[in-house]
């Protein structure tokens, strides 16, 4: 039905999905002509697998930006270039509630960036850090002893960046909470108001089990 397919995966540094998708792409590209002919389609088909270089909400932002470019009917080469360039311009804030849980999940994936002592002290002292970074490279930029305080800090930052001007008219927010808890997040309604005022779409979602 389509002439071009784009698959954007979670960062290849934390998952094998990119490699598996690339293998699938090679199979598709080697065998698509028969299926395309049977469907009555003429011309070539192309497929591209792109490493989003993102985890959590960053991948959703890239998907929204990609769809926007497609709707603008940019050329195939321009689309590929713009998407791959944009992956290096996405910044993410993460607020983990349980550092010990985060460490254990990361350790099973070979990531030893968070020490056992840091995770233990964070849990004992009820510290909720705000981690900020580009792609998967992040570092703590704030530490609070209240989850809601950390959330409000991030909401305030998001509103500030929104008012300063964004490269794409989207803000992606993904939460490992129930919808009731999400709606009660401090600063969420102010963020919604700021998005509406500046013509920005808020992409609000529950975090999938593989992320949370």
Where are these regions (language model features)?
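Glycine/charged-rich beta-loop-alpha catalytic/anionic-binding loops adjacent to active sites
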Residues: 2-7, 37-50
């Amino acid at each position: 039905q389509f002439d071009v397919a784009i698959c954007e995966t979670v960062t290849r540094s934390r998952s094998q999905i990119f490699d598996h998708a690339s293998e699938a792409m090679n199979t598709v590209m080697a065998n698509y002509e028969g299926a395309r002919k049977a469907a009555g389609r003429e011309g070539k088909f192309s497929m591209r697998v792109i490493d989003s270089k993102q985890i959590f909400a960053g991948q959703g932002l890239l998907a929204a930006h990609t769809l926007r470019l497609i709707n603008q009917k940019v050329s195939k080469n321009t689309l590929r270039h713009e998407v791959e360039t944009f992956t290096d311009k996405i910044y993410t804030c993460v607020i983990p509630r349980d550092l010990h849980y985060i460490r254990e999940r990361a350790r099973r994936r070979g990531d030893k960036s968070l020490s056992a002592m840091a995770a233990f002290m964070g849990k004992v002292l009820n510290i909720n850090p705000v981690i900020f970074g580009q792609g998967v490279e992040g570092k703590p930029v704030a530490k609070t002893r209240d989850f809601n305080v950390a959330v409000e800090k991030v909401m305030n930052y998001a509103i500030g960046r929104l008012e300063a001007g964004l490269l794409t008219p989207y803000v992606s927010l993904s939460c490992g909470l129930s919808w009731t808890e999400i709606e009660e997040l401090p600063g969420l309604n102010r963020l919604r108001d700021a998005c509406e005022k500046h013509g920005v779409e808020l992409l609000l979602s529950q975090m999938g089990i593989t992320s949370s």
